Curated annotation (Swiss-Prot):
This is Anthranilate phosphoribosyltransferase. The lineage of its organism: Bacteria, Pseudomonadati, Thermodesulfobacteriota, Desulfobacteria, Desulfobacterales. It is an enzyme of class 2 (transferase). Disulfide bonds: none annotated. Binds 2 magnesium ions per monomer. Homodimer. Mg(2+) 1 binds at residues 92, 226. InterPro entries: Anthranilate_Pribosyl_Tfrase (IPR005940), Glycosyl_Trfase_fam3 (IPR000312), Glycosyl_Trfase_fam3_N_dom (IPR017459), Glycosyl_Trfase_fam3_N_dom_sf (IPR036320), Nuc_phospho_transferase (IPR035902). GO terms for molecular function: anthranilate phosphoribosyltransferase activity; magnesium ion binding. Anthranilate 2 binds at residue 166. Keywords: Amino-acid biosynthesis, Aromatic amino acid biosynthesis, Glycosyltransferase, Magnesium, Metal-binding, Transferase, Tryptophan biosynthesis. Pathway: Amino-acid biosynthesis; L-tryptophan biosynthesis; L-tryptophan from chorismate: step 2/5.
């Protein structure tokens, strides 16, 4: 079956969602040899992935994942694809604490850096969060403090079967896209940054197929896989089962546009310092971009009417100390229970 479907991709035909799921199930069960996995990756990348293929692959990966149960009806993730090459600080990770500071349940999915100096796992580790916390403990932490970090390798062990092929081929493939679509806590509200403007609608449509309630998939025209405050941002909104795409400009949000260099980060230690400084209330462009992104996540969660309302709530969570309190609570909880 795998080889038949591979021939279909090679001939330039798109797969149905269930066909992609079948291929991924075979890969993630260890049934497929490395050369065939490499061929699958390369053929799909050459043809160009569709949103149905993306959803089909994500569905398989979700089924194989170690799941955690969260009692809240609203669970937010701010995990993006990464790979934008912009070398900014960890905007979406910092935003996650602000969202949690507004009383919204956050299950932040993430990993170590692939292409940047510092991934979400790297900065959280530098902040004192224990990464290798058992899923049951993470589940408990989300219930008790309202936020948890889901370190991808702890939940997606079946991905090990694809790793040799990924390392051998060395190209950006469908596997680079699946992280934000495979949250082990089943996050139903997302702010999802992507590395290419062509992916915003594709990811929003995939999230629709996967049953997300509301999501914003974003890409800054300056290349950021976040809502940018340096340039317009392309936004694909999934709401009430419909996807619509629009651009949003910094001035529409009453934010003073800045140069992207003002959002620069560094290694894990430097980025940890930036995150802490923002959550402690230091004003400036770095705090502004976090407020904008957290604000959008709050709209996705249904606790803010629009981006400006979300931004006001995000700013209040920083100024009141609630956002910093969530970081401190997560560090304490993982250190004591990890």
């Amino acid at each position: 079956m795998f080889s038949e479907l591979l021939k279909k991709i090679v001939s330039g035909q798109d797969l149905a969602e269930d066909e992609t799921t079948t291929m991924m199930d075979a890969i993630m069960s260890g049934e497929v040899e490395v050369p065939a996995i490499a061929a699958f990756m390369a053929a799909l990348a050459t043809k160009g992935e569709t949103f149905t293929e993306l959803a089909g692959a994500a569905r398989s990966m979700r089924r194989k994942a170690t799941r955690i149960q969260v009692s809240s009806n609203t669970v937010v993730d701010t995990c993006g694809t990464g790979g934008d090459g912009a070398s900014t600080f960890n905007i979406s990770t910092t935003s996650a604490f602000v969202v949690a500071g507004c009383g919204v349940t956050v299950a932040k999915h993430g990993n170590r850096s692939v292409s940047s100096k510092c991934g979400s796992a790297d900065v959280l580790e530098a902040l004192g969060v224990k990464l290798d916390t058992h899923p049951e403990v993470v589940e408990q932490g989300i219930e008790e403090i309202g936020i948890g970090f889901l370190f991808a390798p702890m939940y997606h062990s079946a991905m090990r079967f694809a790793m040799p092929a990924r390392q051998a081929v060395g190209i950006r493939s469908i596997f680079n896209m699946l992280g934000p679509l495979t949250n082990p806590a089943g996050a139903n509200c997302q702010l999802l940054g992507v590395y290419d403007p062509k992916l915003t609608e594709m990811f929003a449509e995939a999230l629709k197929l996967l049953g997300a309630r509301k999501a914003y998939v974003v890409h800054g025209h300056d290349g950021l896989d976040e809502i940018s405050i340096c340039a317009p941002t392309r936004v694909s909104e999934l709401a009430e089962g419909m996807v619509r795409t629009f651009d949003i400009l910094p001035e529409q949000l009453n934010i003073e546009a800045c140069d992207i260099s003002e959002l620069a980060g560094g290694d894990a230690e430097e980025n940890a310092g930036i995150t802490k400084s923002i959550l402690e209330g230091t004003p400036g462009p770095k705090q502004d971009v976090v407020v904008v992104n957290a604000g959008a996540a709050l709209v996705a969660a249904g606790v803010a009417e629009d981006f400006k309302d979300g931004m006001a709530k995000a700013k209040e969570a920083i100024q009141s100390g609630a956002a910093l309190g969530k970081l401190e609570a997560l560090v304490k909880f993982t250190q004591e229970n990890g």
